[in-house]
Amino acid sequence: EHVVVNALDSPKTKETIKIAFSISQAFSSSKLTLVEEISASKVAVQVDDDLTLKKATLKKERLTKEEKNRVEDVVKNLPKEIQGDITWKTQSIFGKRGYSIGHYAKVVRADLLIMNSKEKYSFINRLFAKDLEHILAEIPTDVLIVKNKKNG
């Protein structure tokens, strides 16, 4: 069993990761992957030559390291009994939120994809597809959506 969970920078993520570890233990999952989706716009560097290519690569590496450290801090602060003996890793992916993690779950043949519930949106924001809409438009695997009552 392979469980993939979104670990995006959100107030809901800590609880989602905690639940992902609990579910992984319940299913005796052999693997848990915490995926940080990084928007391509954060690396918005036009590559015209070797110098700008190097700049874009360094920026991606820095963002990947920052996200990995953030997620590792969340896991370190979980009680040891929740972590159990689950083998987990982090994976940074660049692209459109929702679509990227859905595609990743499909490629790695995840048995379960765990996502945060939607953030509250204004009327204008509802006109544009959000991460869950991308996932639900083409469901790559079983999906569990965690709704955290404290944060929405």
Q: Where would I find each of the regions flagged by the language model?
A:
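Generic structural signal for residues in well-ordered beta-strands
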Residues: I86-T90, V143
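Charged docking surfaces used in two-component/phosphorelay signaling
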Residues: S92-S100
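Small/aliphatic-rich secondary-structure junction motif
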Residues: H2-K60, K76, K80-Q83, T87, ...
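Amphipathic coiled-coil/heptad-repeat helices and related helical stalk/stem segments
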Residues: T16-I17, R97-G98, F128
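A short acidic, amphipathic alpha-helical/loop segment
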Residues: I19, H103-Y104
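Gly/Ser-rich helix-loop-strand patches that form or flank binding pockets
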Residues: E1-H2, Y104-G152
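A conditional alpha-helix N-cap/helix-loop micro-motif detector
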Residues: T13, F94-G95, N125
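Short, surface-exposed alpha-helical segments at coil->helix boundaries
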Residues: T64-K76
